[in-house]
Amino acid sequence: MATLTTWMNNVRAGTLTRQANGAHSFRYDEEWLRSPRARPLSLSLPLQYGNITADAVYHYFDNLLPDSPQVRDRIVRRYQARSKQPFDLLAEVGRDSVGAVTLLPPGEEAHLEGLRWQTLDEAQLTALLTAYQSDIPLGMITSQDDFRISVAGAQEKTALLRMGEQWCIPQGATPTTHIIKLPIGEIKQPNATLDLRESVDNEYLCLALARELGLAVPEAEIITTPRIRALAVTRFDRRWAQEGRVLLRLPQEDLCQAFGLPSAMKYESDGGPGIAAIMTFLLGSSEALKDRYDFMKFMVFQWLTGATDGHAKNFSIYLLPGGSYRLTPFYDIISAFPVLGGTGLHLRDLKLSMGLNATKGRKTEINAIYPRHFLATAKAVNFPREQMLAILQEFAGHVPQAIESARRTLPADFSSHVWQAITENMLKLHARLQQGLQAL
């Protein structure tokens, strides 16, 4: 039997146990259960006394880790982890996870202490962000073993601390403030090669467009050195307090975790939640009206921008005291429009991750979707028609201005290909949106 102590903002919340047969269980600490600050680690692991042995325990902790088997393999080799099973990986890199979770070995405590960090110069930052090319987990080249982080997702990413204008490696229990993403590169598929070498510019523009259109998204900036180009995204699961002297971790989880699902079921086509399931789930939000409105608005935004990867792990909730929750900002938005043509995809190949309702069956193909399908979906999920119409009309009236406003935020060396591919296709769908509304 092996255990890891689970902490939330330096308060002991419970214990993760792995039995000799590989079975996992979780037990909340009794003092945590009695605390007015108590909240569940996950909605799939509700506050209760005694051991929780459901499959959701394994799935929750597994979802704290990177999806990529290659990244997991690098963590095993870098830290000589016993295996690439979630428990063994989190024993090595669980000190700074998504949300407020810190995982430590028995006997080691998460102390509330002052912020500590090591500043990075340009050469050190470059070395840190190119280490994965030497088969080292991204960001984990420091000889100081206390810098071990876990950032979920499929993309090469790490996390760093920003202090003023300086990028830093946090030390001790100091959290990180930014997710750092490198270009995705080329993805080989059976019938196409998806060129996402400019994914940094792609995501930056998608976030800028979402922000201009009134959607809550994190701030982002492109960072460059002579050898790297990366996207630094402000973590919305961190918050400065006490006039910048304390950096808090905010409890949150993605929807795979909230639904108790493995990451292999993040797509609706693989059994994961779709629009109907998520809209029903958001009825329980502490801000249900706002969250349901924003979620449906984001569905339209994904269509307009060709953002085809809106699966359950790309939506998250804040976990609030007592078990209440609300939607976090939207994140991990990348358009598929820049990969059209050449050895890439055809427009007819682009499909949304979550289907829309149609007269017959479901619609996922971006080129086959019209405003009426959003209205049909709204009806199916008990979302008021007038609100869905208001969302569609808002996009119809504001997309060109949002594109122009986003353009003014771009750095001078921004990819012209990414800009043209996203905005030109977005304007084509915007024209379809306007025509579709006129036809209603």
Model regions and ranges:
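Phosphate/dinucleotide-binding and metal-coordinating scaffold of catalytic cores
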Residues: 1-312, 316-440
